From Swiss-Prot:
UniProt keywords, alphabetically: Cell membrane, Electron transport, Heme, Iron, Membrane, Metal-binding, Transmembrane, Transmembrane helix, Transport
Gene Ontology molecular functions: electron transfer activity; formate dehydrogenase (NAD+) activity; formate dehydrogenase (quinone) activity; metal ion binding
Locations listed in the record: Cell membrane
Annotated function: Allows to use formate as major electron donor during anaerobic respiration. Subunit gamma is probably the cytochrome b556(FDO) component of the formate dehydrogenase.
Origin superkingdom: Bacteria
Official protein name in the record: Formate dehydrogenase, cytochrome b556 subunit
Assembly and binders: Formate dehydrogenase is a membrane-bound complex, formed by subunits alpha, beta and gamma.
Transmembrane domains' residue ranges: 23-43, 60-80, 120-140, 155-175
Species of provenance: Haemophilus influenzae (strain ATCC 51907 / DSM 11121 / KW20 / Rd)
A GO CC term attached to the entry: plasma membrane
One Pfam family of this chain: Ni_hydr_CYTB
Entry keyword annotation includes Isomerase: no
Amino acid sequence: MSKIEISNDTRIIRHRTPARISHWMLVICFFMTMFTGVAFFFPDFAWLTEILGTPQIARAIHPFTGILMFFAFIYLALLYWDHNIPEKNDIRWAKGVIEVLKGNEHAVADNGKYNLGQKMLFWTLNLAMVTLLVTGIIMWRQYFSHYFSIPVLRIAILLHSASAFMLFTGILVHIYMAFWVKGSIRGIVEGWVTVRWAKKHHPRWYREEVLSKLEEDLLNEQSGKVGKTKVLFKGFGK
């Protein structure tokens, strides 16, 4: 039983500022790395290198934006890995995936902070990112490629290309799902979601990790206490 009445329109923190900054840095680096990578792999798209000035500049920048992308991702991975460990409760989501696609996720699954689909994507992107980093270093002509034999370089190129495709596909799915689930974009842009959204899409996260902290924040607010809240979103800079 809740200690205090909580409106479904109450705003709660979904992603804090450091995570959102890292996420959008990752987005920028992803597109810069993707555009240059596609241009190198497919000659018909060589014009994409002109976005950064010249093909030479694009080739020089590509590995560095890739490394920045990797570290931005790793920060997020370390921040959220414990929320992405598969658990027995995820089986309900898998069995009810058709209902999930119909928009009835709340009727078949009791999700924590992330559902099974998000967890699968998380670990897929981890695999792709690590493979891209390792193979990219092997292929980096200016510094490292001369240390490796031609067969190793060929395998690295093949794995790099496959991992890039895996990453690109995963990001497309991520973008589509973010727009498909209304309210998700706001969570990563502004950092907050409503209690209604949390109850519908991630009810166990709301019950186990948010509710008690939210009650405390609201009680403090009612009693006139000021300061940093735990989960209650009070606006930027507050």
